[in-house]
Each structure stands twice: as structure tokens, then as C-alpha cells.
């Protein structure tokens, strides 16, 4: 953060330094023992060894979701890597959905590609099938193909490489399994299993029941890394929290005098804004607000999504003229202030302040105090 100052003990878990970010679909952080937020690692040894084989072009054997062994070769690994690259393009835009990429191949040639681009919009498989139609000239340029015949037959007999098991239920979008079956796909290569109880193997089962060959766990470690937070939330029903702070090489987070100054460089600050783009919410204590007057918005070189901004403020001390409140009035990202102050007591000054904040677009969330206040 800009202007990080020496933290002072606060009640109600309020800190003047650092920020915590709760994610529903952040990508690229995986958990390791003793290091809760280590980038790009923490996968199981079997999967890592398999990926190493892929890098050398050797076939690797995995157990598929039916319990039988399946093999994949260097081509399978190559096309799955491309699907992973595509999936990353949705980072920050698909919350709370997972990141998914899909590549459709016939006779060693890519005939369609797609990824889940935005929450509520078409999934990766349907986008890839629509791309098949566009490339073949059977679909209107820039327009999605028919959900009933997503590739207009041009993907008949092809192989689909998908980073996550295709969905088989109806939500904001129809099942991807139906689209793959209708398109005449002959083989589906899956990276990650979907732990969502609505899928959880049922997608692969539906494809097999339709006569489609399904090979699972291809580059599973890399595919799992795409959705470490989605998997955590689905499995544990709790937010995946990333702690971020600025620290000097000798382990200090502020000057001895306590005055605020930059201790991070432009690369680190750019990384922070990339985090904010990819995460669903950002949380700070009132100490940070009082010391730094931050905006907590995503300010990348290219447009990014904006996380919900959360302030832990046990006594409702947030200044009404601070940057957070002003930006909320100007239509910036949502702002939630969690407080233990007696905002329900109409006669209290805190209740009047809460009403003024609400009139400016701030959501004041009343929570019961814990033992520490």
C-alpha cells in the first residue's frame, strides 16, 4: 500500500498496515504447508511429476474419473497448455465462477478456442464451439452460435481440451455437456475435476453415457492452480484470504519515526493492483484508513474489475470526508463498513452518522462485538 505506517494495536482486529483480500475466484495462489499464499506451487507430488513428464514429451498415466487408467501424450499436454493460457484471460472477470479454457482440435489442428470471459456469459466450451463455427464460415462473425447446435456440425469428431470438467447443470448458462454432445465431439480431455456437488464427476459421466471418450487429469496441477480459490470456497464454504503487506529487506514495515513513506517499488505496486483486479473484496482496518486515506481501488494500466471495499471499524470512526467515502459518492466500487457501534440506537450519534454514510452509498454493517471489543 502507499504510505504504510507503523501498526498500532487496535480493538476489533483493526490494523494500520497491510490489507487482507477475500477472493471467490482468485487465481495463481496455491497453498503450501507453512506458507498459506505461495504463488504457483503447493500441488501434489504425483501431479508435479506428471507435469514434468509432459515437459519432456513423455506420456503420463493418470486415473480417470471412472477409475481406469488413461494416457496422454505431448500433443495432449500442448493443447491443454493452450487451454490454460486462454483460461487466464478471464481472471478477475468471472467471479464467483471458475476460470475455464477450451481448445477444440481435429487431426492435430486447432479449429476453435474459447474461455469463460465474464460471469453470467457463455462458458468456455460454448465459446470454443462458436469459434469453430466462425472459423468454418458457418456462424455469423462475432455472434454466438445456436445453443441447440453450437458448432453447426463443424466440430464433428473433434477433441475438446477443457481445463475443468464440463458442467452438467443449468444455472445462468445451459449445460456445457449438452453443447459438446450436440456438436458431435468424439473425445474430451479434462484437466481438473470439478468439486462442485452439482458436477463432481457427473459431467464426465454424462459425456461417457453419450459415447464420448473422456480422459481426465491431464496437466491437473496446472489446471488446479487456475482455480485454487474456487476449489477452496466450494470445499470449505469460507473465503480464501490473501494477506498483503509491504516490508523492507530487513523485515521492517515502517520508519522508526512512524511517518508514512513508500517502501515498495513500481513493480510491487503493479502487482497489488493486479491482485485487486482478480479478487472479489479487499479488507483493511480503520487504522489504515486514518493513517493513509486510501482509495482501495484497482488502478491497472488496462481496465480492471473493482473489488468490494471493506473497512473493519469497531467504533465507526471512518471520516465522512475520507477518500473512500468520497469515491463511493462518485460511483466507485462498493464500500462496506463493519462496525460494533450502536447504529441501531436511533438516539446515538453513531446511528445518525450511519444514516449519513448510507445516504452517500456506504453500506454500514452492524456486527456484535467479540470478547476483545
Please name every model-derived segment.
Residues 100-106, 245-246:
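Short beta-strand scaffold segments in enzyme catalytic cores
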Residues 227-238:
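Flexible, polar/acidic helix-loop-strand segments at domain edges
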Residues 96-99, 240-241:
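Short, small/polar residue-rich loop motifs at catalytic or cofactor-binding pockets
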Residues 75-95, 233:
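Short, basic/aromatic recognition patches
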Residues 158-168, 236-247:
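N-terminal pre-triad scaffold of radical SAM enzymes
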Residues 2-75, 134-156, 344-347:
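Intrinsically disordered, low-complexity terminal tails and inter-domain linkers enriched
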Residues 142, 147-150, 232, 242-249, ...:
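Active-site ligand-binding patch in enzyme domains
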Residues 104-222, 308, 340-346, 363:
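Zn2+-dependent cytidine deaminase-like catalytic core
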